[in-house]
């Protein structure tokens, strides 16, 4: 009986509140119009629901459907199209005299310091505009920084060359030559290392090259440097014989020798003080890297021991930290042929292939998941696309960028990125499955929302 009387009181209260709501809405239409009355009605109903819940016990039927109904109500009423501003704010005031029947109020005069909407940056930029803005901010290196980096790299090369000749006078190292993307106009900010080539002067006729696929390592990227003419020139005739492993010149032994020298024997603080910068070896890296810090810039110098091309059929072979059976082999350096091919393709049609490469390098270097994609991977992507007969103008740069992302995603799906100059080499062969998944997810998301990569 008590429950029945409680429901009766609730019903009578609801009817009384409902009549009040109807009265308010009827008068609100006259004053606020239809739109204002609708908003007032929704707010009134919400207040009514709160009162009902506070004055009555929870009902099972109400709790089941309230949540999604409230969400749908909010979803239906929240996105309203903004109405245009009144004419008084969008048009100048009339200069005629006011009507005598209407009292004139003083019009507030806005101060000259009122913010102007014309100074606000546009909120909607095209993808092409965002891409070019990223290029200007993160890719293009100031010419003064390029000049300073070249000067410091050249000075460090001279100091290191003098050290090698005094420390290892019996080893005929050639002149150390700085180079790399910085010297070829392909430096994406401070992303790429400055290359410092330390050539080994091998005796003609005492050394020959063996393709890596013909060795026990079966590595198509590498070459073995074999000692020959041992019957006429036995071991010990060449100063490089001390680095032989199984009759082959070992890149691993040479790397260990030079790494110990660079990290323990060279007085880098004194050299840095002389050149006006800080220099220290990166002992955590397997490569021979020198960190250079100037008050205006920072960059990394990679010291690369190479077997140059005159005696090796114009191939440039690098002493690189390889693993497994290939640890004593020499990695073929494709950088010279890659840059030459890109330059030739751009010269044919005044294209933007090298600009696309710099954009890809800048984005990948700035993303923790994409940093695994290095210069060689991105260069091969641009070379594969660069051979196609499509537009390579600046206006098509955004389209080519998205095309490069699609190509990378497709390559990651197959876990295969063939080398442009040697299709038997898979540049993704050393990637772990987790790395491929992480990179593929980021690139696929970037295809859906390209601006998220910037």
UniProtKB/Swiss-Prot annotation:
Q: Which InterPro entries match?
A: Mab-21_HhH/H2TH-like, MAB21L/cGLR, MID49/MID51, MID51-like_C
Q: Does the keyword Mitochondrion apply?
A: yes
Cystine connections = none
Could you identify this protein by its name? Answer: Mitochondrial dynamics protein MID49
Show the taxonomic lineage. Answer: Eukaryota, Metazoa, Chordata, Craniata, Vertebrata
Assembly and oligomerization: Interacts with DNM1L.
**Which key words tag this protein in UniProt?**
Membrane, Mitochondrion, Mitochondrion outer membrane, Transmembrane, Transmembrane helix
Return the similarity comment: Belongs to the MID49/MID51 family.
Instruction: Give the stretches traversing the membrane.
Output: 23-43
Asked if the record carries the keyword Mitochondrion, the reply is yes
- Where does it live in the cell? Mitochondrion outer membrane
Signal peptide location in the record? none
What's any GO biological process attached to this entry?
mitochondrion organization
Membrane-side (Mitochondrial intermembrane) residue stretches = 1-22
Stated membrane topology is: Single-pass membrane protein
Misc remark: Does not bind ADP or other nucleotides, in contrast to MIEF1.
Summarizing the function annotation, the protein's role is: Mitochondrial outer membrane protein which regulates mitochondrial organization. It is required for mitochondrial fission and promotes the recruitment and association of the fission mediator dynamin-related protein 1 (DNM1L) to the mitochondrial surface independently of the mitochondrial fission FIS1 and MFF proteins. Regulates DNM1L GTPase activity.
Q: GO CC terms on record?
A: mitochondrial outer membrane; mitochondrion
Disordered, as annotated region: 76-113
Source taxon at top rank: Eukaryota
* Cytoplasmic domain ranges by topology: 44-454
């Amino acid at each position: 009986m008590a429950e029945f009387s409680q429901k009766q009181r609730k019903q009578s209260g609801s009817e009384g509140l409902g009549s009040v709501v109807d009265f308010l809405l009827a008068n609100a239409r006259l004053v606020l119009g239809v739109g204002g009355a609708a908003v007032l009605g929704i707010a009134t109903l919400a207040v009514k629901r709160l009162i009902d819940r506070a004055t009555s016990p929870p009902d099972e039927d109400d709790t089941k459907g309230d949540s999604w109904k409230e969400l749908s109500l909010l979803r239906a009423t929240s996105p309203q199209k903004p109405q245009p501003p009144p004419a008084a704010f969008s048009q100048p005031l009339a200069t005629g005299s006011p009507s005598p029947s209407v009292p004139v109020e003083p019009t507030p005069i806005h101060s000259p310091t009122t913010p102007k909407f014309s100074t606000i940056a546009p909120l909607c930029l095209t993808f092409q505009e965002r891409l070019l803005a990223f290029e200007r901010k993160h890719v293009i290196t100031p010419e003064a920084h390029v000049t300073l980096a070249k000067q410091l790299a050249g000075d460090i090369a001279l100091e290191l060359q003098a050290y090698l000749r005094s420390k290892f006078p019996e080893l005929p190292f050639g002149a150390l030559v700085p180079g790399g993307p910085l010297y070829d106009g392909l430096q994406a900010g401070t992303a790429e290392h400055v290359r410092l080539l330390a050539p080994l002067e091998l005796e003609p006729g005492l050394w020959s090259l063996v393709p890596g696929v013909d060795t026990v390592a079966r590595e198509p990227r590498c070459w073995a440097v074999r000692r020959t003419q041992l019957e006429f020139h036995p071991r010990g005739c060449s100063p490089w014989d001390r680095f032989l492993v199984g009759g082959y010149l070992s890149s691993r032994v040479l790397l260990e020798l030079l790494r110990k020298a660079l990290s323990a024997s060279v007085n880098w603080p004194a050299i840095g003080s002389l050149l006006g910068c800080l220099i220290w070896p990166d002992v955590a890296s397997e490569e021979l890297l020198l960190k250079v810090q100037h008050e205006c810039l920072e960059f990394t110098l990679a010291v690369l021991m190479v077997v140059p091309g005159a005696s090796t059929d114009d191939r440039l072979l690098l002493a690189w930290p390889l693993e497994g059976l290939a640890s004593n082999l020499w990695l073929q350096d494709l950088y010279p042929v890659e840059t030459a091919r890109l330059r030739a393709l751009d010269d044919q049609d005044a294209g933007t292939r090298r600009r696309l490469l710099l954009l890809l390098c800048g984005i990948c270097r700035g993303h923790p998941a994409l940093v695994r994609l290095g210069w060689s991977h991105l260069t091969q992507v641009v070379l594969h696309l660069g051979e196609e007969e499509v537009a390579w103008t600046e206006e098509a740069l955004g389209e080519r960028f998205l095309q490069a992302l699609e190509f990378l995603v497709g390559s990651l799906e197959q876990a295969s990125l063939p080398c442009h100059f040697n299709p038997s080499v898979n540049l993704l062969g050393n990637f772990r499955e987790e790395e491929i998944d992480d990179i593929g997810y980021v690139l696929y998301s970037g295809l859906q929302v390209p601006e998220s990569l910037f």
